[in-house]
C-alpha cells in the first residue's frame, strides 16, 4: 500500500468520523429535549477522541501499550457500532421532507459495503501480533461487517421495504463488504491477495478429482434420503422445500465470506507466521481447519442443540482441512468458494432450514466416514509431489512480496 493511498484512507476515516459523530451529537441534543445529552454526549466525546487518536498520531514510542490497546478497542467498537451511527445519520436526514427515506436506506446499505475500509487501515492495520490479527478477524471484523446491513436496520424509526430486510438478513451484502475490507487490510499487512487462476503446475486429473469429490458430497449431503448404509447411496429425495432467494443468498454468504476469512485471510496469516518452520504447510492447514471448526461453537448460543453443534464443529473442521488443501493445490480461491456455497445452498433449500437438528446414530456414523475421507484427502495432498506443488505455489504466489 503506497503512502499516498494510506493518507487518502486516513482522510476518509477522519471525514467519516466527523459526519457520523456529528450527527450522533445532534440527535442526542434534540431527542426528548436533550435529556440524554449530558451522559450520552460525554460517552460519545470520549469515544470520538479515542477513535481520532489512531488517525492523528505519528510514529512514536510514547504511550505504546495504551495505543495498542486502543487499536483493539476501536476495532471492536467501530466494526460493531458503525452501522448504528450510519443508521442514525440516515434517520436524521430522512426527517428532511425533500429526501426519500427508502432512497437514503438504499444508499446507506450500499455505503456499508465500503465504510469499513478506512477503519481497517487506520485502526486495525497497526495490530502486529498474528494471534491478535486472527482474533479480531474471526470475531469483531467478521461479525460486524457481515451483519452490518442487518444492524443498520435495527433502529425502529427506519422503515425499510421487505426486500431490503430480506437481503440484509442473508448477509450477502456484508459478505461482499467483508471481501473488500479484508483484501485492503491484508495488503496493508504486506500480504498478497488470494490467487484466482488455477495453478499450472497442478495435475489436471487431481483438480478434476477434487471438483468431483466436492460435487458428489454436496449432492449426497443435501439429497440422500437413506437412513442406513444400505440405503444412503440408493434412496434420494431431490425435492427443494425452500427454493427461495433468501435461502440461496443465505447459503451463498458463507461460501463467500467464510472462505475469504479462513481459506484466504487466516490461512495466509498462518502460512506467513510459520514460513520458517519445516512443517509450515501442516501447521497452517491443520490449525486453520481446527479454528474453523471451533468457530461454529457460537451456534449453540443461537438455540441450536448442543449435540448438533458438536457435530457441526467436527464436520466444519474436516471440511476446512479439505477446502484448504483444495485451495492450496488448485491455486484458485474460487474452487473452495463454489464447493462451500454449493454445500450450504443445496442443504438449506432441501431441508428448508438454516440450522442443524439433533443427529441420530446413523448421522454420527456418516460424520465419522466424512472425517476419514476428508482427512485422508488432506494428508494425500500434503505429501509427495502434491506437497511440492503446494509449497512452490505458496512461495511464488501467496507469500511473494
Predicted feature descriptions by range:
Residues 206-207, 282-287, 313-314, 334-338:
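Hydrophobic alpha-helical transmembrane segments
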Residues 25-35, 90-108, 119-140, 151-260, ...:
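Juxtamembrane helix-loop-helix connectors linking adjacent transmembrane helices
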Residues 47-65, 115-125, 182-184, 263:
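Canonical alpha-helical transmembrane segments
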Residues 1-7, 58-73, 125-130, 191-200, ...:
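Membrane-interfacial, low-structure loops and terminal tails that flank and connect transmembrane helices
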Residues 2-11, 20-38, 54-61, 331-401:
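C-terminal membrane module of polytopic membrane proteins
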Residues 10-12, 34-49, 100-115, 164-177, ...:
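Alpha-helical transmembrane segments of polytopic membrane proteins
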Residues 7-26, 42-48, 71-88, 111-113, ...:
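Alpha-helical transmembrane segments
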Residues 257-287, 325-332:
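Membrane-interface helix/loop boundary segments of multi-pass membrane proteins
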